[in-house]
């Protein structure tokens, strides 16, 4: 092997940037295909791998997390934290039973331990994931098969929004009304006239025309 001498700063910068780019792509930011972070996709896939009769009935959260860890080996706290976030999402596809915490009270209330809570898929999730069986499967990091992405009508992040900070910037995706997203989808399929949809959370708009340019051309300014 040839010895290569490099400055410590160069090594940190080069490999640090490579690591950050990989983390952003694989874990921190939603995938553009289905709008899900990898832990979200793995959680939903655990439900979708069950029979319909089982997934629409309440399951112990500890059991769900146990199955998720077969795909997502980054600790039960991370997986359960994501499950709590999905149950409490604005347009949640999961329903919960037990203490799932509260963000509305003046005092922060954390969710109960996973052994005390239960959750199941909402009926609306059956429609959203209707094409899940057509997912392209890949071998996950532990060796189990998992979907590269799940075919969905529109990216999940557009329903519930997303905010994340990375080493070199931040990602902020506003939330849209589900009905408006389906209206936009029908327009893109040529089934309905164009309707400019507006986010209802996560963004402040200066002018309607400015947002129309942002939506149709990708050019505009938001706060």
Residue ranges of predicted features:
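Charged, surface-exposed alpha-helical interface/stalk elements
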Residues: 218-223
